[in-house]
């Protein structure tokens, strides 16, 4: 319903709830459970009576690492767990609470951030609101302002002057003067407007820097000729280069953008292109390339903008519907160890500087209309949609020329100043994303789901959806804003399910201020914690140089938080949380924080990264489910490192055997993480009491030893063979296989085992990149796979093959050749060691 950062998938928390809350069979019931004949995989767990009633106790008892799938069969069922309480002390966007509530649990959520509280509040209220009331309120706002707002985003239809088209996106470029010759320089990185569509999908729309015309070209990296004025240029080469420099085409001077601003210049802005959508042409049956495309701005387009800017300047009543405070100095608003962007160096001072005048006029007009809705519950839903649309209504939003769409601000959890940006249609039209009407529709879809919740699941590799569940997305819930270390809470929760702060977590206070400063305009009179100018900073548990909090402070505060959780959790309760996989320092700090507050870490399970995380440097973000339980008796006796290592090795080995005997297929790295969890379970029973050579080992040292113990020596060869086993291996498969190993995807690419340019593919011995690697590698550095591929290359020449084979033949190579023949159906491998 609204942007929140690092959200875990709902399916992740549903799975966590399924395996966490179903502990006491007497509390569990399944609504509308199908007869066993309809679900053969569960028939063995029936009581055997004529009603085929499910024996939930037997089902729960059947689950272990070898047979984890029994409970999984209940994933798409309407499972209810009676008399169960769940706490999330770091609720964020509320996903954990919503999923626990679907199981019938009574849930309590806490978050320091008012935006998180407001978003989660409306998510729970979605099942309580009458959709007709929402529709009536929207129609009131639509009647009030939609015509005025849409009129300001219209342009003359390029194909028929008798009517107008809608502006989907208005594209702006900023400019500075050359500090030497004073020529005005538009700050383009290149002159590509957008990738071509439809019949022109192999071409690009480009802007002529001479006349401002827009035309199609075959290749932006080569000389292009403007179809309007004949100007010749290379569209890929704009004045702005890497490092934030801009070059003058007249005198050739290159100068830092931020230095020019520091010396007194300010950005000027110019409208350079419009993406339009003509509903009249579409309704008349025109081709898609006619009713949707790009055009140069006309005098009328400039006038529409100027009219809006004038109304904004002259309408004092609207000023109270836009934030006017100064942007706080912070770790992501100014340059710091967290972010290299410094918006102040680009001339930003107040929140209003993040929007152009037409945006300010339209957004304030829309918010004023929302404020007129009498019912505060309904008005808050409209405010939520308005707030979410702000991501795409600002001058940090960029136009994705390859995807022909707008990309919202804060995509990398920071404020990134743009030299060109996309202005969205505030109200919206038939095309485009992030408009008020599209975010409103997204909210209505969420409300509908809250009233009619379903679940999607895979069966026979096809996605299915259940019928609507009886339990709504609501139930008993309590949501509190405040510091979880201080707020008043009942104790004896059955489970704490959460996603706690990480060491290098998103600085939520700073990114959420972007929404908060708008939300508080309507909420400050109703909620005290929306009165301050910005969200709380000093109490956030995060490493933040702007508030003087380093890693040590973070670990101390996280430990206090776990201590508070221990106070609130029943002695037989369970703590389950998601955590980002990290190095020994990260895991060591976490284990110290847990064990120091009387928790025992009992298991770890890797999962895919959360919904918003991006992959960088070929390394995926691995999230781990961590399971811990309260310790009610004193921890174990002191132990030597050698004895602990033996215990941990046995436990890890047993875990691996159970996994390998199951029908699951985790990657080697994923298995290693589960083994690490078993090792840390053994250590948590002797926390702070492990001795080696007369000294007590610190936790980071122990974790590092365990990581070496479980990682083994996974080789690129093994990962390559695993990829060959797959029917259609992908880049994502490669990343998964490399999870928590000492191998990176780059290692395979460097060896020529995979290619990952425009498309991902598995290389063979015959690929040029593979042959180049083998030719450049010394004999003593060749792996068994390298040697087999060399033999396969020489198999066409009997003499060379005989010489190579006499030198290298081993049983390992013979077996590997047979395996490659099986995996690749290349019979050439079969004859490598036979005359």
Can you name each region flagged by the protein language model?
Residues 87-94:
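Class I SAM-dependent methyltransferase "Motif I" SAM/SAH-binding loop
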Residues 586-596:
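Conserved helicase motor "Helicase C" RecA-like lobe of SF1/SF2 P-loop NTPases
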Residues 521-525, 564, 569-575:
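Short glycine-dipeptide loop
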Residues 555-571, 596-597:
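A short glycine-rich, Lys/Arg-flanked "PGG" loop and its adjoining helix->strand segment in the class I
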Residues 94-95, 506:
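Conserved SAM/SAH-binding loop-helix junction
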Residues 89, 110, 498-500:
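Conserved beta-strand/loop positions that form the S-adenosyl-L-methionine
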Residues 1-87, 101-492, 505-547, 561, ...:
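Nucleic-acid modification enzymes, centered on SAM-dependent nucleic-acid methyltransferases
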């Amino acid at each position: 319903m609204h942007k929140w950062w690092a959200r875990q998938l709902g399916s992740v928390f549903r799975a966590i709830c399924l395996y966490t809350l179903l502990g006491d069979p007497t509390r569990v019931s399944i609504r509308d459970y199908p007869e066993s004949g309809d679900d053969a995989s569960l028939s063995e767990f029936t009581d055997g009576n004529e009603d085929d009633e499910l024996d939930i106790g037997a089902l729960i008892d059947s689950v272990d690492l070898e047979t984890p799938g029994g409970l999984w069969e209940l994933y798409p069922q309407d499972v209810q767990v009676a008399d169960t309480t769940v706490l999330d002390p770091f609720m964020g966007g509320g996903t954990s609470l919503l999923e626990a509530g679907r199981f019938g649990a009574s849930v309590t959520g806490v978050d320091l951030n008012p935006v998180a509280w407001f978003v989660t509040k409306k998510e729970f209220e979605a099942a309580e609101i009458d959709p007709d009331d929402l529709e009536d309120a929207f129609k009131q706002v639509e009647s009030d302002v939609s015509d005025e707002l849409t009129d300001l985003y219209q342009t003359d239809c390029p194909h028929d002057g008798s009517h107008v088209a809608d502006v989907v996106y208005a594209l702006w470029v900023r400019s500075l003067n050359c500090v030497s010759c004073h020529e005005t320089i538009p700050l383009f990185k290149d002159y590509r407007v957008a990738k071509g569509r439809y019949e022109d999908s192999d071409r690009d729309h480009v802007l002529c820097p001479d006349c401002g015309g827009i035309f199609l070209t075959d290749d932006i990296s080569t000389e292009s000729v403007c179809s309007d004025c004949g100007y010749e240029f290379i569209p890929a080469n704009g004045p702005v280069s890497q490092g934030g420099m801009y070059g003058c085409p007249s005198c050739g001077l290159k100068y830092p953008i931020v230095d020019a601003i520091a010396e007194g210049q300010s950005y000027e802005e110019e409208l350079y292109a419009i993406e339009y959508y003509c509903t009249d042409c579409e309704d008349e049956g025109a081709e898609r390339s006619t009713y949707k495309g790009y055009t140069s701005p006309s005098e009328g387009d400039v006038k529409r903008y100027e009219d809006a800017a004038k109304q904004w300047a002259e309408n004092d009543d609207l000023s109270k519907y836009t934030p006017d405070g100064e942007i706080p100095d912070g770790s992501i608003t100014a340059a710091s160890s967290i972010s290299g962007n410094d918006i102040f160096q680009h001339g930003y001072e107040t929140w209003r500087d993040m929007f152009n005048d037409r945006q300010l006029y339209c957004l304030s007009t829309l918010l004023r209309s929302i404020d007129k809705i009498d019912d505060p519950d309904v008005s808050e839903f409209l405010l939520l949609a308005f707030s979410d649309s702000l991501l795409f209504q600002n001058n940090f939003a960029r136009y994705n020329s390859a995807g022909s769409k707008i990309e919202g601000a804060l995509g990398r959890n920071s404020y990134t100043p743009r030299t060109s940006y996309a202005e969205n249609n505030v109200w919206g039209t038939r095309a485009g994303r992030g408009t008020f009407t599209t975010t409103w529709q997204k909210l209505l879809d969420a409300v509908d789901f809250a009233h009619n919740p379903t679940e999607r699941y895979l069966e026979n590799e096809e996605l299915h959806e259940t019928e609507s569940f009886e339990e709504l997305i609501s139930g008993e819930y309590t949501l509190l804003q405040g510091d979880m270390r201080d707020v008043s809470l009942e104790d004896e929760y059955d489970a704490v399910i959460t996603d706690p702060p990480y060491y290098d977590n998103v600085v939520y206070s700073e990114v959420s201020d972007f929404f908060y400063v708008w939300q508080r305009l309507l909420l400050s009179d109703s909620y005290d914690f929306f009165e301050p100018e910005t969200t709380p900073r000093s109490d956030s548990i995060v490493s933040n140089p702007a508030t003087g909090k380093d890693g040590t402070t973070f670990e101390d505060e996280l430990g206090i938080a776990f201590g508070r959780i221990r106070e609130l959790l029943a002695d037989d309760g369970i703590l389950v949380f998601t955590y980002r996989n990290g190095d020994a320092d990260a895991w060591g700090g976490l284990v110290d924080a847990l064990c120091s507050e009387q928790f025992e870490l009992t298991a770890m399970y890797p999962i895919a990264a959360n919904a918003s995380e991006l992959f960088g440097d070929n390394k995926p973000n691995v999230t781990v489910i961590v399971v811990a339980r309260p310790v009610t008796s004193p921890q174990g006796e002191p132990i030597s490192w050698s004895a602990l290592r033996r215990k941990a090795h046995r436990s890890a080995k047993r875990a691996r055997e159970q996994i390998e005997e199951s029908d699951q297929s985790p990657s080697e790295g994923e298995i290693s993480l589960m083994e690490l969890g078993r090792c840390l379970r053994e250590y948590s029973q002797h926390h702070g009491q492990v001795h080696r050579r007369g000294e007590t080992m610190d936790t980071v040292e122990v974790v590092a030893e365990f990581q070496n113990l479980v990682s083994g020596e996974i080789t690129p060869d093994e990962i390559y063979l695993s990829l060959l086993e797959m029917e259609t291996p992908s880049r994502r498969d490669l990343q998964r296989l490399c999870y928590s190993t000492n191998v990176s995807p780059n290692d395979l690419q460097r060896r020529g085992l995979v290619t990952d340019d425009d498309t991902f593919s598995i290389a063979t011995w015959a690929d040029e990149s593979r042959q180049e690697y083998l030719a450049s590698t010394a004999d003593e550095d060749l792996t068994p796979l390298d040697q087999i591929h060399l033999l396969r290359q020489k198999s066409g020449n009997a003499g060379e093959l005989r010489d190579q084979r006499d030198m290298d033949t081993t049983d390992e190579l013979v077996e590997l050749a047979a395996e490659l023949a099986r995996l690749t159906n290349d019979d050439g491998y079969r004859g490598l060691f036979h005359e």
